[in-house]
A protein has these predicted regions:
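Substrate-recognition/cap helix-loop segment adjacent to the acidic, metal-dependent catalytic center
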Residues: 92-110
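Alpha-helical recognition domains of nuclear gene-regulatory proteins
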Residues: 20, 79, 97, 116-119, ...
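Short alpha-helix plus adjacent loop in nuclease-associated cores
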Residues: 113-128
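Conserved non-catalytic scaffold segment of RNase H-like nuclease domains
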Residues: 2, 10-93
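Short coil/turn segments at secondary-structure boundaries
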Residues: 15-17, 34, 50-53, 99-100, ...
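Acidic, Mg2+-coordinating catalytic module of metal-dependent nucleases/exonucleases
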Residues: 91, 132-167
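Acidic, Ser/Thr-rich intrinsically disordered and amphipathic helical segments
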Residues: 71, 75, 90-93, 97, ...
């Protein structure tokens, strides 16, 4: 399985700044994680600061790699081929961002932790951000490194695993 997150420029969501993902085994998901974080070089001059922090240099679960969007898309596609399913948080947006970069998720089953949380934890129509759900489920996280594509992918995987225990 593979959890992913895409960070975009806050004033133009078509500008992809980072792609992060974590690959994990279905058999032992807690023990087998490999995290990736790609910083898109041609968009490095776009900096988030109004609505979300620019945390692209705060990847804590591996080493960030700087590369073109074309190269990042190719590497992402190499890993997605082997994934049984995908995990995301509020994934409709990320799916659209990836599609704009030529990355198709068609044919892949996708679990959205935001929708899973809505179904499992509430009886209403509340929408929960990643930070809120991590906190509500007592999953340890560092708030200062959220809004980094790689970190958010890792936290999304942890959230998914916690939610599956509630089924």
């Amino acid at each position: 399985m593979m959890a992913f997150d895409v960070e975009t420029y806050e004033n133009d969501f078509s500008v992809i700044l980072e792609i992060g993902f974590v690959v994990s085994s279905l058999a032992r998901p807690e023990d087998s994680k490999e995290a990736f974080h790609f910083i898109i070089t041609e968009n490095s001059h776009f900096v988030n600061r109004e609505y979300v922090p620019d945390n692209r240099d705060k990847f804590e679960f591996g080493t960030s790699e700087r590369m073109s969007l074309k190269e990042a898309a190719a590497k992402f596609m190499q890993h997605i081929r082997d994934a049984d399913f995908l995990v995301t948080h509020s994934g409709a947006h990320d799916e659209a961002y990836l599609a704009s970069a030529g990355i198709s998720l068609e044919g892949k089953h996708m679990f959205d932790t935001q929708l899973l949380a809505l179904a499992l934890l509430t009886s209403g129509t509340a929408v929960f951000g990643l930070k809120r759900l991590l906190s509500d489920l007592a999953i340890p996280f560092d708030e200062d490194i959220l809004h980094n594509g790689g970190n958010d992918a890792v936290y999304t995987m942890k959230l998914f695993l916690a939610l599956t225990k509630k089924i």
